[in-house]
Amino acid sequence: SAWSIGVFPIDVRQGSLVTLLTVGIPVILLAIWARPGYRYHQTLVRRLLHFVLPASILASLIGLGVFYGPLFFQLTPAVKALSAEEFLAEFVGIIRINQSGLSAFLVVVGLLLLPFVEPPTAWWVGADRLSGDWRPTWLAVGLGCVYIAVMLTPLRDFFDLAPLTLPHAAFAGGSALLWLFLVRLAWRRRLLERFFGVEPSTDAQ
């Protein structure tokens, strides 16, 4: 949803970085690290309801707030105080920094999924069984460091990202923490399965 709403909250270059860090690299390494042996199986519907939909719906809804919330408070006074030409010049910079805030949120959320895929401790159990495998968690930490390095170097301009102000960074980080606890609650309580009347799998954790 972040690709298709309003004034394009995230552009292609920003989206490519988000996808690389949260999908491209993790998918390859998780496939390499996959352990042979018994894995419980769920139908596609069960898997969508339990894992995919809660994470994506919450990320989409909170992401809308991450982008449009600050945008509203920044643009409202600018409309009243600036001429049309000044407003257009200001608008470009405001959009870019809010796109960067949303990109940060999506990266953090995507990386927070990795410990849930292979829970290293009981706290992370919700989307899958306890595995005790710390490699995906350390991968998330490493990719988070890569993202920080991008934001602190000229690579930031290559991906069309703006430096985040402290309020923007705090808002994006706080929103990611909100997503973390809400999605964990949704997984553990199986809220979507209950809403749609789907019985839990006997093989589920």
Task: Label each PLM-derived region with a short phrase.
Residues 1-122:
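Membrane-embedded transport module
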Residues 10, 91-98, 129-130, 161-168:
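Interfacial loop-to-helix junctions that mark the boundaries of transmembrane helices
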Residues 45-46, 126-136, 197:
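Cytoplasmic-side transmembrane-helix entry/capping segments in multi-pass membrane proteins
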Residues 49-57, 133-143:
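Small-residue-rich segments of transmembrane alpha-helices in multi-pass membrane proteins
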Residues 58-71, 141-157:
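Hydrophobic alpha-helical transmembrane segments in multi-pass integral membrane proteins
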Residues 110, 168-186:
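Alpha-helical membrane-embedded segments
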Residues 119-122, 183-199:
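Membrane-interface capping segments at transmembrane-helix boundaries
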Residues 150-170:
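Extracellular/periplasmic helix-loop-helix junctions in multi-pass membrane proteins
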